Structure formats: C-alpha cells, structure tokens
From Swiss-Prot:
Key words of the record: Cytoplasm, Exonuclease, Exosome, Hydrolase, Magnesium, Nuclease, RNA-binding
Species whose genome carries this gene: Xenopus laevis (African clawed frog)
Subunit details: Component of the RNA exosome complex.
UniProt name for this protein: DIS3-like exonuclease 1
Cofactor dependence: Mg(2+)
GO CC field: cytoplasmic exosome (RNase complex)
Length: 1040
C-alpha cells in the first residue's frame, strides 16, 4: 500500500473556497466488479459477461445526464470514483443520494470502481492543472487500465460532452473509445428512443439555463439564505422548519408549513404557519422542506371559509377565517421534486408565449404545482397528451421553474394514460418482475409439483390435529391468513391465527426481497392491482388455499373457555392444510344458521352427509365470533374508536360497461376476522419488542391535534350533541351517544368527520422513540404492528423475520439495526401514503367515468339524495350515501345570484344575499324571503362532471331541491345502526374493468382476460386497506 497526499479545493455552504489536504492510499487489490475478471473478489454486484462493451461517463456527463444513465435498459455502466465525488461536491446531496441508490440497486447493471485507490488507475493532479482537466485525464487513464485489467476481452467507451477531450483521447488507445454521449446513444442503442429523447431534452434545458443567466439579472423573488444560516436560525428559534403543503383548492393563495418540531427557544407557535400568496412562498414547491420566518402579528392573515373551484372535504378546521400565524419562506432545507405529469397548452396559446416557440409553459395535472417552463421541439405533436417532466431549477429571476421533457404517457382522457398519470403523480414505478427475480421462484407445475420438504420437519404439524379454515372475499386467491379454534383436554380454548410464511420463500437481500422492499406494498387501483411479490408466491405457494399443504407462521393462544382471558401464547413455524375456504357471505350465512351454502357451494357439499363435521365447522365459526366480540369489548373499554369510512365498488355490466357505483355492505363476520388479526398483531408486537427493544418494527398512531376536531364539535352541537375529545375513550363514548333516532346518517357522518381529524398511523423503529410513544390511539393498544399480511406488505415480512429470530426459528445476522430500520420505515410509510392516494384517485377517476356519459338533466342516476355536513360562506359540503361521494354545492354563483327555494322545494337562482351561521347558512332574496340550509338537512342534488384539459375531471353538485329525494332508497348501513360498527372494517373492492377511451373520448372496451391472468383476487379483498380510512390510513382494524 502506498501513502500519498491529495489536495482538494472545496466550497463551503456559504460559497467560500477552502483548500484541504487529505491522506491518500493507493493499493493493488481494488475490486473491479467485472464478471470477466477471475482475480478480483466476486462478491457484490458484477457486470455481466454477456455485455458487448462497458461505458464510462466522465464527470460532466454524470452530473448533467444522470437521469439517462438511470434507465435499466442501459447496461455495463462503470461509475468512476472520480466522477462520483464530483457529483457529491458539485451537485449536492440530493443527486448524490440518487447516484448511491442507483449503485446499490441490484436491478441496475452499473457499478462503482474506486479508481482513485488503484495504484495504476489513479493519476495525481499536476501543478496548474484545472480540476476538470485532471478529472478527465484520471477517468480516461482508469478506462485504459480497466480495459487491460480485463485482459482486453471487452472494449471500453468513455462518453463526454467535451469535443476537445474526444479529439485528444479518441485514437490514443485501441479498443478504448471516447465519444460524445449523443453519438454513443445513437450508435450503441439505436432502438432505444426514450434515452435519446431524454438526453436531448436535458441538453436543451442546460443550454436555455446558460442563456437565461446571461440575459437577466432582475429578481422576481428574494434569494434563499444559505443552509448554515438557516440551521443556525432554526436552532435559535428565529426560523421554523417544516414541510410546505399547498391547498389544492386555492393553490395561488394558500399554503401551510407543517412544523416538524419547535425551535430551540420557547415559543407559543403550536400550529401550522400560513403562507399567503406565491411571493412569500419564494419558489418553494409542495412537499419541500423549508425554513420560515414569522411575520409581525399585525401582518397575520386567516384562510378563507368560502368554497372555490375543486372544493372537497380534504381538510379539517375550515369553519372560520380566523387569523393564524403567518410567515414567509426564507430558504429551502431540502427539495422534494419528483416527476410531474403535465399537459401542453392549446396551440394558439403556445405561439404567444415568446419569440422562441420551443420554450413552453406547461400546466401540471396537480393543482398545487406551478406551471413549468420546458424547451422542446415536440410541443405541437404532444398537444393532447399527458407527458412527464422534471424540474431542474427555479432561479430568483424567473416567475416559473425550469424543467425538461421526459416521456409521453398517452392521450389525455385515455383510460390507460389517466391510470399512468395517477401512478407517476404518486411516484409509483412498476416494471414486470425481472428474469433474475423469477429465477429465484420455486416451481409448482403438474410435472414438478411443490411438496413439503423433509428438512422442514421441525415445524409444528397441524394438518391432522386442527380444523383450519379461511374466510375471505369470494373468488380470493391470495389467502394471507387462516384460523383454527378447538377445545383442549383441559377445557380451555385454543385459538390459532396462521399466516403465510413468505419469508421461507423470500430470503434476505435476494432479488425478490430487494424488489419487494422497493415496492413496499401491493398497489390497488379501482380496476387492477400491482403486486409486491411474483404471482407464483402471492396466488399459489404462499396462499393458504384449501386442501393443500402450506407453510405458515402461527400465533396460538390458550384462553379461558368462559372469560376468554389469555393464559399462554405460542409462536412458531407450522404446516397447515386448510379444510375450507369460505367467502364472507357464506360464513355469515353459516353464522346466522342458514345452511343453504351446503347446496350452493361445491366445497361444502360433503357436509350434507357428515353432520358431525358440519357441527364442528358451525361451532368454530360461532365460537370464534364470540371470542372476537369479547376481545373487541375489552378494547372498547380502553378507548378503541369505531369510525367511519366510505367504500365504493364499481359494478360492471356484461360488456364491462360501468353500470353502477355500489357502497360496500358490512357483515358481522368482517369484524370477527378483523379482531382476530388485531389480536395477532398486538401479541406479535409485544414479543418482538421484548426480544429486540431497540430495533423492533412497530406501528404507532399518535393522538390527533385538537384543533382538527373543531368542525366535528360544531356539527355535533347543531344536533344537540357534545363531543369530548380529551382522550380516545372520551371521543368513543361521545360518538356512541350521538345517535339521532330519526336519521342514523347523523352518527355515520360524525364518525366520518372524526376520521378526517385523525393523525396518520405509521411504522417506526422502537429505538427511535420512547415507550410511551408506542401507543396506538385508534385501536387503544400499547403496542401494535403488522404481521398478518406479508403477501402484500413488506413491513410484515420484516416483522416475520424479527418474530422468527425471537423464537429461534430464523436467522438473526440479517436483522436491521435501529438506524437502518428507521430509514426503511420512512420508505415504507411514504410508499403506503402513495398507495392510499393512488387508490383514492383511481376510484375518483371511475366515479367520473360513471357519470360522464350520462345526461344530468334527464338521467335519473344523476339525481340523488344528499346530506349537508359542512357550511361555508358561499355554499355547503354534501355527502351522497347512494354513491359514497363527497362534494360541494354553491349557493352563490359567479353572477352574484343566490339559490332560493320555492314552496314546492324546487330551487332557482335569484338576486339576494347569504349569511353564514355556525350550523346553517341563510339565503335572503330581494323580496326579503329567507331560506335556511342547516347541517344534516337532506337535499336533492344533480351530479355533473366538470372536464378539464389539464387536470383530472371532477364531480360538481347542484342543489335542485331543499327536500330529500323521494325516489332514493335508503342504504342498509344508514337504516340499521347496528351495522355502523362493522363499517370500521374496510375492504378494497376491485373489478376487472378493461376500458380504453378512444382518441376522441368515446369508450372502447378491451377483453378482461389479459388482466385476469395477472390478478390474484377475483372480486373483493379485505386485508389490503383495513388500516386505511379513505385518506388517512388510520385504522389498523385487521392485522392485514
């Protein structure tokens, strides 16, 4: 090993140049990472032997065109340490982290070569030599060494944007080529148009940025403060740090900074900080981590209480326009830029945006994102397309951020393009499982059937001793869990929850494990799903299907036969053979004593001739329901919440047209299964925390902020109820008492509003929190985790590994420490939020599709009963039970007319005024006639669709009568208060809609079979979204 010195010229965060001297060690045994080399260690990522060449980007190409190199189709990429360090020092933490992630990702065929530690690859910097010239010379010398090290078996191509470098080095060494990046893409990847298009888009953006910096010095915004000044200000309490959240309904006017912790000094700021207008936002974009300076109290403002475009119930606490802490953004702590879907303006608008028609202001799909300026030659060709762009910069002299074109998704209005838009907007990128991942999968064919292995003999075998069965949605193929219950010789009960043993098939750090970790969850849309695991696992070998042997991880309790108090618990690996695969409907019929399924369900036909076996099954379902009820009552006594969510499924006709939107109906057996899953999750949480108190993965649900309950309290007060929100127990008791015998929907709406006020539940590592912070507010449990759905949640896979290590049935050397586990939890939480938002937006898409082809003036399906649940200064918020839709209706239109009601209840627009009161809004006409719209009033509405060229279509509601719709049938959940409690349990309902809208917007349907091939569940699936209450991921009501 040779010791030398390396002189670095660095810049501080304030821009000051610093000369630093570092010790530098050179070695002979630096790993090359090529599969062609048989002398270096072969651990870690290796470049394939099958490649035709290796490609090495120089520093400038890596910095400016890293996005192009991220395409997995580009293979054989060698990132030199010299170029990697240039990114770190010159492009900042964000791009460097992306580069490190790319190098770690086994799905991308790229490696890091530590050329500056290799004795013969490294060249010291010469006196007077510029940093860029030295970096280029060092990288080229490393390319030559690498080519010779691989015994000249494969050519090496160095790509650069510097023509002088090409002229100097291109002919210097045979089989080591130096070419421009564009020539490389055109020559070596002629059929990969996407990479070349992205390269040209980035190139044009860099040229435009250089021109703009020369042309204009005028400031549109103040400069951001340097990072070290911001950090000092946050520490002293002068500045506050938080995430910028833009109100999508008033994106130009209202945004809020949600504080991530108070400063070092005492402060009375305990709420969000209001940012009024775009100038004080100072180029911050929704999701950025920002530093904010509070304005003087005399300049504080309040958010408006009026309806505006796109008003829905996405927020809480908008009852009054009270003054709140107001500030301005002084700096960006961390950008949160992502891919954005945009649409080009109409042709006539494009031509008026400047002399250079290649520079276009495109409109983002997301209302919260400002217009983005891009340079492209495809503006006219992509007029009616949804396209993806990325933001590159936002200089202080520009009104809008600068970005570049990435790719087109398809025509706006086309179903597949709209679905792709939703995925991109939620940063979800799902490629088919790779050959490497599928190669890890076991086989289960007719010729080579899968069987229980002899080496698994230490598992507890339940196949002959236990009646095991599952209860799932009809047609479900991905069965995560099965149950058993029996009476022990001692007279006690034994209850078992058996969960698919996914970790047996998905070993740590395999290709499948890495892909599952990246996806973190299965993504559900209204008409399809994208799985976390390959189909052979999720729908076959990990699925606890009936009459086949399967591996499971089980939790088995021994409990008192009368009180159901738990005496002992056992955890471990098992082998099971499920006897019955029941649907929820069939299980509910059996629970109710209805034996019709014995004739209608083929699986149950043998029970007609076996009354003893039938009684055993009936007893098991009934006893399990009793145990679940007792367990639930104990949680209720501790303060468990019974809240409401809205779940709607798309009902298809024979030709796959959308025939109806149907709210999901709850069953008692839903709650039974959910409670058993909660019990298993709770006990597993206790076990893994006891074994690994510093790095167990648990799930917490923090108490909600009290100000979010304000609208709930006001609404309850309007009906004479008082809501106590001091604790979860007080809230639960208050909601139980808030029943209106004349209208059960009142209690349902109050519970839905309580749900809106809740905080988000999230995963965490126990070493990062104190024990009193572990509490799950919604479920009233001291410790909770997710164990029961490893097929569709990566968190459950981690918990399985922890549990098996804790009971000495699994390896311990791969368990994550607290820091790594906390980082993984942040990733999973982010992916879960994306999955929830994606599912919500896709359902809204199909709701709009359902109404879009209907005439709202003549089609009775567009006329519905609605309930007022919110009052605004110019309108009301409505809930439509028939379709599970929330929306807003104006009482004052753009012409200044107000909505007045005739004696027969019909409404019309007249001159007049509005007066907003806490529980009602009063309409007064010029003739001095007054009408009131009160909270919880039933009205009749007309449903229309508002189409948008740039944004998603949205539902618009018009009040046509201040009386209930006489033809509307009441929902069962509204007419039967006893069913309200089981609405806590939610299941995603999905269909196999195969629709593609034609170019001009007409529906063109495709066969469903193509997607059914990849689906796991035919029909409804419970455990996908049980902890989600529409937007908030609150309720972990099953262990799913």
């Amino acid at each position: 090993m040779l010791k030398t010195e390396k002189i670095l010229h660095l810049k501080t965060q304030r821009g000051r140049s610093v000369r630093a001297v570092r010790e530098h060690y050179l070695r002979e045994d630096v790993r090359c990472g090529s599969a062609l080399c048989h002398t270096c260690p072969r651990d870690g990522k290796l470049l394939s032997e099958e490649l035709t060449h290796y490609v090495v980007p120089d520093c400038q190409v890596l910095q400016d065109y890293q996005e192009v190199l991220e395409f997995p189709e580009l293979r054989g990429i060698i990132i030199m340490q010299t170029a990697c360090q240039a990114v770190q020092h010159q492009r900042g933490r964000r791009q460097y982290k992306k580069l490190c992630s790319l190098l770690r990702d086994t799905r991308h065929d790229c490696i890091l070569f530590s050329n500056e530690f290799q004795n013969h690859a490294y060249l010291p910097r010469e006196m007077g030599e510029s940093a860029l010239a030295w970096q280029t010379r060092c990288i080229y010398n490393s390319c030559v060494w690498y080519y010779q090290h691989c015994q000249k078996k494969i050519p090496v191509v160095m790509v650069t944007e510097d023509e002088s470098v090409i002229g100097k080095y291109n002919t210097e060494t045979q089989e080591v080529y130096v070419v421009s990046f564009q020539i490389y893409l055109e020559t070596f990847w002629p059929n990969f148009k996407g990479a070349l298009e992205l390269y040209k888009s980035l190139r044009d953006t860099h040229l435009e940025r250089k021109l703009e910096s020369r042309e204009s010095n005028g400031k549109e915004y103040p400069e951001h403060l340097p990072l070290e000044i911001l950090e000092a200000g946050i520490k002293s309490g002068r500045y506050k740090q938080g995430v910028l959240s833009v109100n999508k309904h008033r994106a130009q006017l209202e945004s809020f900074v949600r504080l991530q912790g108070l400063g070092g000094k005492e402060t009375d700021i305990q709420s969000d900080i209001f940012i009024h207008g775009t100038k004080p936002r100072n180029r911050a974009i929704h999701g950025d981590l920002v530093a904010v300076e509070l304005l003087p109290k005399s300049e504080w403002k309040g958010r408006t209480g009026a309806l505006c475009e796109n008003e829905t119930d996405e927020k809480v606490g908008d009852m009054q326009a009270e003054v709140m802490p107001t500030g301005r953004v002084v700096g960006i702590m961390q950008r949160n830029w992502r891919d954005y879907v945009v649409t080009f303006p109409a042709k006539e608008d494009t031509e008026t945006q400047g002399k250079n028609t290649q520079k276009v202001l495109v409109m983002p799909w997301d209302y919260r994102i400002p217009k983005i300026r891009i340079s492209t030659q495809q503006a006219e060709a992509l007029q009616n397309y949804r396209v993806v762009v990325r933001i590159d910069s936002w200089e202080s002299n520009s009104l809008y951020p600068n970005g570049h074109f990435v790719r087109a998704l398809g025509r706006a209005g086309n179903l597949e393009a709209e679905i792709a838009t939703i995925l991109v907007e939620n940063s979800i990128s799902l490629n088919p499982f790779s050959e490497a991942q599928l190669a890890e999968m076991p086989s289960n064919t007719h010729e080579n059937p899968w069987q229980v292995k002899p080496e698994e003999g230490d598992r507890l075998d339940l196949r002959e001793t236990h009646l095991v069965f599952s209860i799932d949605p009809k047609g479900c193929e991905d069965v995560d869990d099965a149950l058993s219950i029996r009476v022990l010789p001692s007279g006690d009960l034994e209850l078992g929850v058996h969960i698919a043993d996914v970790t047996h098939f998905v070993q740590h750090n395999t290709y499948t494990d890495i892909e599952a970790r990246s996806r973190a969850t299965t993504y559900y849309l209204a008409d399809r799903r994208n799985d976390m695991l390959p189909l052979i696992l999720s729908a076959d070998l990990c699925s606890l299907l009936g009459a086949v042997d399967r591996y499971a991880v089980s939790v088995i309790w021994e409990m008192d036969c009368s009180t159901y108090e738990i005496r002992r618990v056992w955890y471990g690996r098992t082998i099971i053979r499920s006897s019955y695969k029941l649907s929820y409907e069939v299980a509910q019929q059996l629970l109710d004593g209805d034996l019709e399924p014995l004739s209608t369900e083929k699986e149950l036909h043998p029970l007609k001739q076996d009354p003893a076996r039938l009684q055993q099954l009936l007893w098991a379902v009934g006893k399990m329901t009793e145990v679940a009820h007792a367990t639930r009552m104990r949680r209720n006594m501790s303060g468990a919440l019974e809240l409401e969510g809205v779940e709607v499924r798309v009902q298809l006709g024979e030709k796959h047209s959308i025939d109806d939107l149907v709210p999901k109906q709850p069953l008692q057996v839903h709650e039974t299964i959910a409670e058993c899953m909660i019990l298993a999750n709770h006990w597993v949480a206790k076990k893994i925390w006891e074994s690994y108190p510093q790095h167990a993965l648990l799930r917490l649900h923090p108490p909600p902020r009290q100000e979010f309950f304000q609208e709930l309290k006001e609404c309850a007060k309007a009906r004479g109820f008082s809501i106590d929100t001091r604790s979860n127990k007080a809230l639960a008791d208050s909601l139980d008492q808030a029943h209106d015998p004349s209208d059960p929907l009142v209690n349902q709406l109050l519970r839905m509003m309580a749900t809106q006020a809740m905080s988000n539940a999230r995963y965490f590592s126990t070493g990062s929190y104190t024990e009193d912070e572990f509490y799950h507010y919604g479920l009233a449990l001291e410790k909770y985790t997710h164990f029961t759905s490893p097929i569709r949640r990566y968190a459950d896979i981690v918990v399985h590994r922890l549990l098996l290590a804790a009971v000495n049935k699994g390896p311990k050397d791969h368990l994550l420490g607290n820091k790594d586990l906390e980082e993984l939890c942040r990733h999973i939480n982010a992916r879960n939020r994306a999955a929830q938002q994606c599912q919500k937006q896709s359902t809204e898409l199909f709701q709009c599709m359902f109404f879009k082809d209907k005439d709202p003036d003549s089609d009775q399906r567009c006329i519905s009963d609605a309930v007022i649940y919110g009052i605004r200064t110019n309108g009301v918020l409505l809930f439509i039970p028939r379709y599970g839709i929330k929306g807003a209706a104006y009482l004052k239109n753009t012409d200044g007319l107000v909505l007045a009601c005739e004696e027969d209840g019909q409404c019309r627009w007249v001159h007049g005024s509005l007066q907003r009161l806490p529980a009602q809004i009063v309409v007064t006409t010029q003739e001095a006639k007054s009408f009131s719209f009160c909270l919880f009033d039933h009205v009749t509405v007309r449903i229309r669709i508002q189409s948008s060229r740039f944004h998603p279509d949205s539902i618009r509601l018009e009040i046509i009568s201040n009386r209930p719709n006489p033809s509307q049938e009441a929902l069962p959940s509204a007419s039967n208060p006893q069913l309200l409690r089981t609405e806590l349990v939610k299941e995603v309902t999905r269909t196999a809609v195969e629709a593609q809208l034609a170019v001009e917007g007409a529906a063109e349907l495709k066969p469903v079979e193509r997607y059914q091939e990849y689906r796991q569940t035919q029909g409804q699936s419970l455990y996908t979204m049980l902890e989600e209450l529409w937007d908030l991921a609150l309720l972990d009501v099953s262990g799913a």
